[in-house]
């Protein structure tokens, strides 16, 4: 296995390990969710709020908000501390991976770890949508503000609609019949999971990229690596295998809960052997240089159609397009998904050939 393949395989294995680490951080939120549950039940266990005059109600809502702030602030502090540790770990891991790939004769530099942490906080999130461009600390703080407002707003709305304390608590906690999955606190829990998974992806990617930049005499650019299974998003399917300069271009996470990663593309002096490594997919190991649509072409027709839809599946199989051509047809220059009509305008002959 040559140096480039070693790096690719190491990056993909690390991405799998990182998913386990994300789950561990998600699990830590259960403590804070329980504290919120206790806080709300305590504050709503007395007199019916519908009997409160406005000033008294606002005082109670302020008390609830301050309690939420304290709980979520502790969660944010813990998450930020974990992210700092992850940044250091990922940067060090990539330096070791580079050293292993290129051999002891070539010196690999470890970036200054304080600079890595600064880069994590100064680099914008690449997620598409409203959170795109945010820095990581405001991204976490916005979650705290949003969830507090959601809960305080639900209490205020319940009072003005004449709901009893019990009904308001049920709206917040959910019902036992639905395993409490239908309450506002479950929304908070799911949003916390997304924040953790997305935030850690950003931290890990930025830390890796800083190591690559510190070794720009060895690393030429970065390559996008997407998870090879049926849950991979449209944007990540199309970005699979694309290469970007060290100092520009899109980076994971491309969306909430993104599982993609980047791997270093070595300078030509280190990539002198043919590729032959392997990476993991949902149905076993495959070639390390296989892109998402290369892999998808190897899957059963039913699976292809379930992932990308019947028409796109037909186009992939019968349109006469290579995997790279098909991938380029999925996104515009701003990495936004194209509709079938948009795709038809760009490649009308492929649609004719596929009979669409």
Stretches found by the model and what they are:
Residues 169, 179-277:
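Acidic, glycine-rich two-metal-ion catalytic cores of nucleic acid-processing enzymes
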Residues 1-178, 272-356:
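N-terminal leader/targeting and assembly helices and adjacent pre-domain segments
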